[in-house]
Structures are given as structure tokens and as C-alpha cells.
Amino acid sequence: MSNRFYDCITEFIFLDDKPQKADVIFVPGGNYPDSARRAAALFLEGYAPYVLPSGMYSKPVGHFTGDPAYRTEWEYLRDILLKEGVPEGAILREDQATFTWENAICSRHVLEKMNMQVKTAIIVCQAFHARRCYLYYKEQFPDTKLLICPVVTKGIARDNWFLDEEKIDVVLGEVERCGSQFHRIIKEKITNPGPCDHVVI
């Protein structure tokens, strides 16, 4: 059994749950196909009746950085889901979010408009992004059981992130953001126990 001093970082960042029956599968936005493909596989295996990809594009960039045939992350992810066999009626729409915090907020708004009660949800995200995704979505869905079913992207996994300088920078950058981006959210909870949609991070 490993006992490296940074194993606690691995356990903190790289969440990985076994999929269970859920009400919806969340797919935070991005310009890579892996998460949509994993979400489609989970859908086709019967784990949830809906998939909710979310995203417009990265706010600092101002446009979708993937295939120029698509205007938004949602369009891109939706197309992959369709190609993988997910029926159009099972794909929900959220195409306004520009970063992960907004993915969580806007996804909640979509489901509230549908009057959907979400007891259990699956989140398919990049493996190194798992903890921060969990924190954002848990803040917006406090009473929902969230299961993280990640995909390895950029070759960054729990068993190799510490072997390469670029991978180390990505993972430790996530650790830093899990602190820096939650100051205002957690402080807001002192007086406001509800969802903190209005907090700017």
C-alpha cells in the first residue's frame, strides 16, 4: 500500500464512484468528446433517463474553442451524444454557462423549470476536475446524492499525475482553485443557507 506524502492530494482530487441508478447525468461543458461518450454509455446501460450537457463557451476566450462547426459546448456535446445513440428527447439543454460554477447553477435552473426532483445524479467530468465539479454541483444540489463517474483526459490520472511537471501543475492548480474559488461561497453560507447563485467567484 502506498504511503506517499501526496497521496492525500490524489484522494482529494480524483473522485471515482461506481454508477448507480440516477435521475439525470450531468456533463459539464468542454471541447473534448470523452465525457459525452461516457455519459452516452451510462445512458444506454440504463443508469438515467436524461443527460444534461451544459455550456456555452469559456468566458475568457469568448467563443467555442473546439470544432468550428459548433457555436457552443452544448451543441458539440449534444452531437456526440446523438452519434453515440442517445435519443434527442433524452438530451436536455443548457447553453448559457461559461465556467463550471455556472454549469452547476444553470443546470439546476433547467431542472427546476421541468419540476424535476433529483434524488440521485451522475456527473461525468474530467478526472482531475472531479473534486471541484463535485463541490460546485453539491452547493447547488445539496439534497442530491452525487456520483462522480470521471473520464481520463490529457493523460492525467490518479496513478500518474505526480510523474510529469505539466500534470503536476494541472492537479495542484485544481487544489488551489478548490480553496480560492470557495472563499465567497462558504462565507455566504454563514447567513444564507440556500443556493448561492449570485456569488461571483
Name the predicted role of every residue range.
Residues E165-I201:
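A conserved mid-domain beta-alpha-beta active-site/ligand-binding segment of alpha/beta enzyme cores
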Residues M1-L163:
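A structural signal for short, hydrophobic/glycine-enriched beta-strand patches
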